[in-house]
Amino acid sequence: MEKQKLIKLIDVAAGRKKADLVLKNAKIVDVFQAKILTGDIAISDGYIAGIGGSYQGVVECNYTGKYVAPGFIEAHIHIESSYVSPEEFSRVFIPRGTTTILADPHEIVNVAGLKGLDYMVNAAKNAKMDIRYMMPPCVPATNFETSGADLYADDMEDALKTGEVDGLAELMNFPGVINADDKMIDEILMAKKYGARIDGHAPQVVGKDLNAYIAAGPANDHECSTLEEAEERLARGMYLLLREGSVTQDLRKLLPIVNTANSRRCLLSGDDVQAKTAINKGHLDNSIRICIDEGLNPITAIQMATLNPAEYCGLNDRGAIAPGRRADMVVFESLEDFAVEETYILGEKLSQGNEYLGEVNYYPIDSVESSMHVKDFTREKLQLHLNSDKVRAIGVVPGEVLTTEEHVTVKRDGDGNFVYNDQEDVTKIVVVERHHNTGNVNVNLLSGYGIKAGAIAISIGHDSHNIIATGTNDDDIFMAVNELIKQEGGAVVVKDEKVISRMELKIAGLMCNLPAEKMIAQQDALDEAVHEELGVPDNVNPVMTLSFMPLAVIPKLKITDKGLVDVEKNAFVSNELD
């Protein structure tokens, strides 16, 4: 802060000068003491000068009867999962009360390397939201797949040194950490060299393995899906992120762990939240409503989205309505309904109701636009030869990124090739490498997705984001993949060799360069086509569910362009049962 601005802030706080803006007679949510205060909020140059006593301002607004809480801070999220650019993310999520995010851009960095990070950083400069980034440490996430880039510790040093990133993002390669893999250790030491925070990712890791993982440096985990996992992490000093995303929704399951003794070690997080979800249901505001609905003290829930993440992330200039803090604020009428009415960032009102009030400018996307590099993709590569009728299939678990290992009996033709049986929910699942023209195409089996006709192909396949497709017949799968390549990414739905819906994601094949509303219209049409025409059940999110099938750092079975991975064994396995 400049000297003259600091002097002015002090003068306003002391009542010697008028504030730029005063919110009069507000019900102030005191997140330090978990209570409600009544008084004024005086703001100078975007910062809170004082609260309580009667202040005078150049502009004064009557907030009698209105609650004012700190703006929400998201400690771990992937902008790419919203399917919109950073600028659009800011526009869509601000009306939901989100004012600061710590984003992990490992999706686009896995596709485009450091130029992907550069794009995200520059695009964020156009956003009113404070978008901060963590450095992705797992590019690629594992050695079981082909990514668009490979990053090592030396590649990260400049960004860590200059503060372009706030720390090291989730250490997804937990087997590498536990087994002291050189690449993982070098990256951890690079982060520690600059005193940077390290985020965790350790699904189903327990006991001594968890001790080893935490000893390496990760300070939080958002991958807990059971109370036992949550308790074990809290007992070992980790911060617990209670996740409520578009697909993975663990919040209600984990809330019973939260009590007065540990609540300040608990944070609310979205991880992967589509723009459509934010508009229709909300973001952290929705998580707070769930907490309240489940009986948690409303102020405790607000702490978990404000003060707690501020302290965890080392952002001591925000997270509370208090002197010297950023005037990032949300306004609402009821602690029971908790509907955000207004959002302020640095003292500027940026939303009223669901309407965003600021301007939006966009950074050029040309550096991350052409990302589909596929060669030698033929229909013949979609054949799946099996040496047995008894095989493994990846089992979809609706609402989870975890999968199961299903043992199924399938039909084969005279040459031993898989034949789709419309009486069984088992289809081909295909990954086509799209970064280096390797020609890699891998075919395995999928159970539980529920598709009954046609095919869908997408360019979102966590975390290396190769093309992933599933369908009931090779003709439709082949056409869907080829159409996806032509449109430079997104999603394509085909039935009877006709494209019936598509969603275009031209930014690295991950994000749309259109306004969120236009993207959502495409997404809604695509979801409807998949549910109505292809028969996928309503409890399966068509794109996001499929996109996690290649994520070979979350158990159990996952598919990559190189083969079928048993994550628990940290090894490839065959389609056939041993």
From Swiss-Prot:
Q: Which SUPFAM superfamilies match?
A: Composite domain of metallo-dependent hydrolases (SSF51338), Metallo-dependent hydrolases (SSF51556)
- Supply the HAMAP family for this chain: Adenine_deamin
Q: Does the keyword Glycosyltransferase apply?
A: no
Corresponding gene?
A: ade
Name by which UniProt lists this protein: Adenine deaminase
> What NCBIfam families does the entry give?
ade
Cross-referenced InterPro entries: Adenine_deam, Adenine_deam_C, Amidohydro-rel, Metal-dep_hydrolase_composite, Metal_Hydrolase
Family assignment from sequence similarity: Belongs to the metallo-dependent hydrolases superfamily. Adenine deaminase family.
* UniProt GO MF annotations: adenine deaminase activity
Q: Does the keyword Membrane apply?
A: no
